[in-house]
């Protein structure tokens, strides 16, 4: 039974073996497809190179026209730039449309890396978005190139000759300030000079320590005596600084009046007086001045007591106040260089023993 079953199996009417012709045909088709893809990629590269060259030429022409038309305002330059940007954007849009309108079939494009990419029509929208982004990036790059070239290009005169640089270039103080802030600077430390001070230590005074505060001209007894004699001679109108009259006839025997000599007296004329003879002059000496200036003994004023003021008032408070006032006046007047009579009169008036009208007399 089994042998009869196997014998009934029929063979296929075509050959199931793979022939060499079939393999060669497949290889030929694959080679044709790769050749077409490579040729299309080469064409696209050539088109890109041509576009780049055209862009460079247009850019150079536009730059030259911008440099030649510097006298125009900013508005004209801005309009030209806008027109150029519009043209470039329209060119990029047209190129993108041409790429996708050539055929709805799949195409092979080479990347900048050298790999082939299959372009399929179902992903057309995504690819258009990518191309638009690339076009915007190209426009931005072109703008940067134009700006850099305009900055680097030298200024030109109306004749077309390049302008000479100014000798003194104005620099921005803002940049210099920012550079100074960034640069590390050493802070200048102000040296505060303090005065030399030494602590004062109390010491018991000695004759040697007191010599530091003595004047250069020592007030000795002889010097005080000389000063007293000079004062007494001036008071007695003795000729100290003028020639004395010794009784011999002279032409110039008149001198100025001594009280006004060396003093400015407005509203008064100069008085000439005849110099008296030397033998007729009398030198006046005041013994109180002698004791006061030479020996250092001043006039001692008599102090007042309560009994002296009881004649003026009966209240005890006013009497005690008058006594205290008289003591203050006496101590202050004792060391004053004055005449004895004048000093006594001032003492009585200030103490309240005499009226003020006596000072005017």
Swiss-Prot record:
Instruction: Give me the ranges of the annotated region Disordered.
Output: 37-99
* Compositional bias (Low complexity): 59-68
- State if Membrane is listed as a keyword: no
Alphabetized GO MF terms: structural constituent of ribosome
Q: Chief location of this protein?
A: mitochondrion
Which residues does the Swiss-Prot or TrEMBL entry list as transit peptide? 1-14
Q: Can you cite a GO biological process for this protein?
A: mitochondrial translational initiation
Sorted alphabetically, the keyword list is:
Mitochondrion, Ribonucleoprotein, Ribosomal protein, Transit peptide
Chain intervals with Basic and acidic residues compositional bias: 43-52, 69-91
Q: What does this protein do?
A: Component of the mitochondrial ribosome (mitoribosome), a dedicated translation machinery responsible for the synthesis of mitochondrial genome-encoded proteins, including at least some of the essential transmembrane subunits of the mitochondrial respiratory chain. The mitoribosomes are attached to the mitochondrial inner membrane and translation products are cotranslationally integrated into the membrane.
How does the record describe its quaternary structure?
Answer: Component of the mitochondrial small ribosomal subunit (mt-SSU). Mature yeast 74S mitochondrial ribosomes consist of a small (37S) and a large (54S) subunit. The 37S small subunit contains a 15S ribosomal RNA (15S mt-rRNA) and 34 different proteins. The 54S large subunit contains a 21S rRNA (21S mt-rRNA) and 46 different proteins.
What is the similarity comment for this entry?
Answer: Belongs to the mitochondrion-specific ribosomal protein mS46 family.
Q: What is this protein called?
A: Small ribosomal subunit protein mS46
Gene name for this UniProt entry: RSM28
